[in-house]
Amino acid sequence: MEKKMFNSLMKIHQKYQDLKQLLETDQILNDQKQYLQIAKEIASITEIIEVFQKFLDDQKVLEDAKTILIQEDDPELIQLAKVEIATMSKNIEEYEKKLLILMLPKDKNDEKDVIVEIRGAAGGDEANIFVGDLFKMYHKWADSQKAKVKVLSSSLALAGGFSQIIFQISGQKIYSKLKFESGVHRVQRVPATETMGRIHTSTATVTVMPKIDEKIEIEINPSDLKIDTYRSSGAGGQSVNTTDSAVRITHIPTGIVVTSQDERSQIGNKEIAMGILKSKIYNLELQKQQQKQSDFRKLAGSGARSEKIRTYNYPQDRLTDHRINFSTSLKPIIQGNLNPIIEALLAQEKTELILQNYANK
């Protein structure tokens, strides 16, 4: 193991011991907020400590076995020492690999909930129907993760689906799992209205943003906002409300426009619209920071129209993620089993981080 990494692990080991002792003091035991904060910090490094302790234990056994080889003349003891050295060396190599991954820099947003925006792009009615299919896919996946889904804003389309839908998913480390969903999703299939059996291609754009919590302050000058109210409408623009409860907010400096009409009151819609706006502004800043990272990690959260990330080919029952050349059966994915593609994308992220880590040394 490299000296720099070993020293870092020793510091984490000492920090772990200090925190464990601190957790048992009367001052912390009587302060629930501090107790939970320290307990959470301990939990965040426990896996590293457990693997590192195994590394240290096996390193000690390895050194003892090497000493036996040098000092002993007994053939049986020498043979046992050789077996021990081979076993411990293999174990240590595996622990080093695990620690390398565990020590990779964490994305500060990984623990956050997400706000997802899906918009129909090329393809007219088919694109809007595809938006609805993607929403159902993410909803089913969220259900499988015991996560909660809340629709924040939606615009129904006459032919089915949505021209746009914005929703929140709340659960455990949701952003870490969905951050690479941003981009252009392409569908190839025969529409129900197609009489000649021709395959049509449509697209939808997906943007995944970390939900901003109260701890993060996003400064928005009220004078930078243009707020309009209007009557909420259903599919095809039909009015479904007799009061101006829907809200449209324009952030003048960035040109970001957000709307909300699904709540019954203007106050409720304004609150939701402001929440979406804050996440969009935060995501904009996040994209600027990601320009300094690897090409693959830049894709998280961008949702740029030029980035065709995935194709859903219905006739061939095939889903392909073009960023990592990953293909699998489409049906399980569209039914909400996103874990195979999520795991493949996260594995690629780890590989990129390891390569980047070595490149910076």
From Swiss-Prot:
Annotated keywords: Cytoplasm, Methylation, Protein biosynthesis
UniProt xrefs under SMART domains: PCRF
Presence of keyword Transferase: no
PTM characteristics: Methylated by PrmC. Methylation increases the termination efficiency of RF1.
Function noted in UniProt: Peptide chain release factor 1 directs the termination of translation in response to the peptide chain termination codons UAG and UAA.
Domain of life: Bacteria
UniProt KW Protein biosynthesis keyword: yes
InterPro entries, sorted: PCRF (IPR005139), Pep_chain_release_fac_I (IPR000352), Pep_chain_release_fac_I_sf (IPR045853), Prokaryotic/Mito_RF (IPR050057), RF-1 (IPR004373)
Family: Belongs to the prokaryotic/mitochondrial release factor family.
GO cellular component, one term: cytoplasm
Cellular compartments annotated: Cytoplasm
This protein's name: Peptide chain release factor 1
SUPFAM superfamilies reported in the protein's UniProt record: Release factor
Gene3D superfamilies in alphabetical order: 3.30.160.20, 3.30.70.1660, 6.10.140.1950
A molecular-function term among this protein's GO annotations: translation release factor activity, codon specific
Modified residues (N5-methylglutamine): 238
